[in-house]
Regions:
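Metallocofactor- and cofactor-centric catalytic cores in central/energy metabolism, strongly enriched
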Residues: 2-290
Length: 290
């Protein structure tokens, strides 16, 4: 149903059979990855939301869309191409993206996460099409608050996954490509824990890279400088944590794929102060002991 509310989806349930108010119409609605239903918009919705002429005539169910999307997925020649297809699908229609994975979780988990996501991360700059997530620059700590303020108010974010990209999935320093591990981990939270994707925030701390290939690569999208250590690094981490606590006080912070010395040190520093978790230290430890 049409309405006058802004497109703030933070408090929507993960799934609903009820009508939702939406102020978007026409091409703007089709460009909204969360609300776009593609060929599943009914005749009534096409009239109400000014979509007539913007979609093929046949109205399809979500099940029919899933069938087509799975066929498209299956024709991709290799796992990286399948990963890229899934990323593209997510950028167009999130409901279809999550439903497709849910129906084929065992097959697609290795595509959207390890091991295939590692290859996608290593090629982040060459495969880049559009940004997703929050990018924090170690040389601009004064802009952290502005950067993190764009995802809603104090009650809008439940979970933040943050990485500095130094030790990604066993493949080492991936620099700014670390944003993809934050995104992938949050997709797993949605699929396996039911956390609404629009109540999460993926973050990368761009502190440079010691990956020589990236430092020499003109198309690398992150800071082309050696990794920052010491006080300047700690200032960015601390500014991020304090800003997250200020802007999203109910959010749980998940530290992901930091280099081991920093991972342990950061966890020890902030565990007494905030709700936080490091998967590589605590998650791996728990699984090993189990």
């Amino acid at each position: 149903m049409a309405g006058n509310k802004s497109s703030d989806f933070s408090h929507l349930p993960l799934a609903t059979n009820k009508a939702m108010e939406c102020a978007l119409t026409g091409s703007e609605l089709l460009s909204c990855t969360y609300l776009n239903k593609g060929s599943a918009f009914t005749e009534e919705e096409r009239d109400e939301f000014e979509l007539v002429g913007l979609l093929p005539s046949n109205v399809q169910t979500l099940d029919e869309q899933v069938k087509r999307a799975y066929a498209q997925f299956s024709t991709r020649p290799d796992n990286l191409a399948k990963n890229t297809f899934m990323t593209s699908l997510k950028e167009q229609n999130e409901v279809l993206y999550y439903r497709l994975i849910q129906d084929h979780l065992k097959e697609m988990f290795p595509i959207i996460y390890t091991p295939t996501e590692g290859e996608a991360i290593s090629k982040y700059s060459s495969l880049f099409r559009r940004p997703e997530g929050c990018f924090l620059n170690v040389n601009e700590p004064e802009k952290v608050e502005q950067s993190m303020s764009q995802w809603g108010g104090p009650d809008d974010i439940d979970l933040i996954v943050v990485s500095d990209g130094e030790q990604i999935l066993g493949i080492g320093d991936q620099g700014v490509g670390g944003i993809l591990i934050s995104i992938a981990k949050l997709a797993i939270y949605t699929l396996c824990a039911g956390i609404h994707p629009h109540r999460t925030l993926p973050v990368v701390l761009d502190t440079g890279t010691n990956n020589e290939d990236f430092l020499k690569d003109d198309i690398y999208l992150g800071l082309r400088q050696e990794r920052v250590r010491g006080e300047k690094y700690d200032k960015l981490v601390d500014t991020f944590v304090k800003t997250a606590r200020k802007q999203y006080p109910n959010a749980y912070i998940h530290f992901e794929d930091f280099g081991l010395p920093n991972a342990r040190r950061i966890l020890d520093e902030y565990t007494p102060k905030i709700a936080c978790f490091n998967d590589d230290v605590q998650g791996t430890g728990c699984v090993t002991l189990a």
